[in-house]
Amino acid sequence: SAPVETKASTVVPRWFWMRTYNKTMSSTVILLNEQNPQGIFVDPSVPLISVDDQGFTRGDGVFETMLSVNRRVRKLGMHLSRLESSARMLDLPDPEPEILRSAVERLMREATAGAETALGEEHIVKIIISRGPTQAVTSMQPGPYTLIMASPVPASIVKRRTEGVKAMLLPRGHEPMDNSAYPWLLAGAKTLSYAVNMAVLRYVQERGADDAIFITDERRVLEGATSSVLVAKIEDGKKVLYTPEPSHGILPGTTQGAVFEAARQAGWELGFGPLYPQDLFESDGVWLASSVRLIAPVTHLNGTALAHDPELTATLLNYLAQQS
């Protein structure tokens, strides 16, 4: 089909069905593709993808979710680095960090109002890279494209930073392995294929919990459904912060990495597993760490109350702020 002209005089394929960006929308979106390598604002109220888009039909793509506070995206460099790693695993074109960084900055200058919280004005910012439509259906061969979106952080997420979450231990269902052992399994890549993660959350929520922590058949702790696991142990003045060992099918967490770096500078010792359920039950604190939720204390595990020190949570949140 023939290309169409937007009001901004930018030629784009008709299959994107674009209109000019509407500032009254709660979400703000920038599209980057072959025709618009630097990105253009698009209207999020109209279809932006083809019906045969492989990101939509197969989950064939990668993404990053970030937190913006007062229009500044936290840990942007770390997220772009992980996005590049994920794209490489899927044989997608390497994202260009400077172009993406510039597009994110433009997005945040124009984004609609975020959520007002104790931290300031907060937005969720997502970068999605899709493989694009299948060549068998479309003759245009537009190739992979990128969407960058900003929207207000939901109040329910902010609430969990202080009130915490109830978690359940669930078996992963398969033994994790070194990330490089079977590259076609995409271990360690942040892909669009999140159906299992969402099914896990529905499963635990139907049983009165908020989140899940995966364990192996040997009961070794892995990670949350959409988060990293942090565990604190304080004894005789010695403070140690643990997380499960990396490179065993665990997605490297940018939030976990930021907290660890600040804790190290503050004199904490760091440990990288292995961790088992008993370590969590006997700890001085357990948290689920992710980019937008930040760190949420786990108040109950399998129905059993865990140690929960609000001051310790505040300390770790302060460490995270230092690394942003």
Regions picked out by a protein language model, each given a short descriptive name:
Residues 3, 117-119, 138, 157:
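Generic marker of residues within folded, mature protein domains
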Residues 3-5, 13-14:
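Short linear motifs in low-complexity or flexible loops
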Residues 5-7, 22-23:
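Intrinsically disordered, low-complexity polyampholyte segments enriched for Lys and acidic residues
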Residues 8-12, 180:
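Residue-level detector of transmembrane insertion/anchoring sites
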Residues 11, 16-19, 109:
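Position-driven detector of the extreme protein N-terminus
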Residues 20-98, 102-106, 135-324:
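Helix-start/capping segments and mature chain N-termini
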Residues 101-136, 151:
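Short, acidic/charged, Gly/Pro-enriched secondary-structure junctions
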